[in-house]
Swiss-Prot record:
Protein name from the UniProt record: ATP synthase subunit c, chloroplastic
Compartments where located: Plastid, Chloroplast thylakoid membrane
Cellular component aspect of the GO annotation: chloroplast thylakoid membrane; proton-transporting ATP synthase complex; proton-transporting two-sector ATPase complex, proton-transporting domain
SUPFAM superfamilies according to UniProt: F1F0 ATP synthase subunit C (SSF81333)
Gene designation per UniProt: atpH
Species this protein is from: Pisum sativum (Garden pea)
Subunit structure: F-type ATPases have 2 components, F(1) - the catalytic core - and F(0) - the membrane proton channel. F(1) has five subunits: alpha(3), beta(3), gamma(1), delta(1), epsilon(1). F(0) has four main subunits: a(1), b(1), b'(1) and c(10-14). The alpha and beta chains form an alternating ring which encloses part of the gamma chain. F(1) is attached to F(0) by a central stalk formed by the gamma and epsilon chains, while a peripheral stalk is formed by the delta, b and b' chains.
Main location: plastid
Length: 81
């Protein structure tokens, strides 16, 4: 394998995971903060807020997992060879 292609694949894999983690990380922090604020204002709605929060966190985490899948494909099933 060409060393330049191997180096580019490793760099691209790192960027894929890193950039795919930034957005969901910020979103999860914001969502958790807003959920805590909502529970503090309306303690009786805690179950509904918690359920919605956990579902939305799972959807946000899926974006990071997609970035990981792309990185693994670049590293082990190298499409550039």
């Amino acid at each position: 394998m060409n060393p330049l292609i191997a180096a580019a694949s490793v760099i691209a894999a790192g960027l894929a995971v890193g950039l795919a983690s930034i957005g969901p990380g910020v979103g999860q922090g914001t969502a958790a903060g807003q959920a805590v604020e909502g529970i503090a204002r309306q303690p009786e709605a805690e179950d509904k807020i918690r359920g919605t929060l956990l579902l939305s966190l799972a959807f946000m985490e899926a974006l990071t997992i997609y970035g990981l899948v792309v990185a693994l494909a670049l590293l082990f099933a190298n499409p550039f060879v």
